[in-house]
């Protein structure tokens, strides 16, 4: 099989992994360029805008038996691989043509994880030393990678991710009995987070973007509170930059093909809650979990908190501090900063001034006063749903080797 076809297969296999603030739900802007098929994906940047990454697996051969993954050892997919030299040369060709600014590299685990990890590290070494590439590289470390390999990855890459898959040993075993949460995945993620944190403090060192992880949500039976407890603990210790969540979708031919899909709304609520913990100053105990330990699918967690705090609201928008503004539904960090800065030099006169500052006035008005006058007499009405939140017209398993869920 020629390199082009192998690259296409391995690029498809890598696209399910999450990167950036949120995966863009649109085709890459490279369009019909001859090199577009090698896995160019558009991702959002934290400060707005987007960039293009080349995303590829070095091999989709795998000896693991993850129940959600089409490339598990019993999966009926063509097994291909590309060498470190082929990966590095293809990426540099794409990069020089202006199609990708960075590389996202992962791999299956055919046999010993250390050997597959060595091939990935060899690719990064070729990029840095032979090709002189100084841009963004994200490497996804494999289960079973050795501590010395984590150190080398932290030297060569800007970002390292280790997929925890689930929040404890019990749940990981239900998904992938070859993986070890407490003895391998979690310590490896913590080591990567520490190494990248140290590098961020070294003058002149390669920019470090922190460590990330990902959870397959639903099929193991875990609760949202359990997932967010792990995420919150790691983020508060500065060992995790952010987490990704992937609502499980069954794939034909995998051990979990008959397991029901996880509602997309649950994935969304986890992302919203993680942002509240990481960027809005919320604590885990402030999030509104149901008796089942899960977030409300009908109402976003910030609104759920606000509705339960009548004594906290309304807030006078011309006086309250930044931290209090962050608690208002419809006000994010950038908008809160804009409000605090603008009221030093101008007078906020009405809804239009708030809207110009970025406030979602429909959501925020009930929780705010402006010069002592409440902007809305009642909270916005919530629209009734025809279907259950996050449900789909069909729950049939995907018949594609590339599901919209994390499998590496």
Regions found by a protein language model. Name each.
Residues 342-343:
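Residue-level signature of tetratricopeptide-repeat
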Residues 255-326, 363-408:
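Long, highly charged, low-complexity intrinsically disordered interaction regions
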Residues 1-64, 360-361, 368, 373-408:
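Flexible, acidic/Gly-rich N-terminal and inter-domain linker regions that tether
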Residues 145-156, 220-236:
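Catalytic cores of alpha/beta
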Residues 72-87, 94-120, 126-149, 154-203, ...:
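Core AdoMet radical
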Residues 114, 167-177, 202-222, 241-264, ...:
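Flexible glycine/acidic-rich beta-alpha junction loops that bind and position SAM and/or redox cofactors
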Residues 53, 66, 105, 162, ...:
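Conserved, mostly hydrophobic/aromatic
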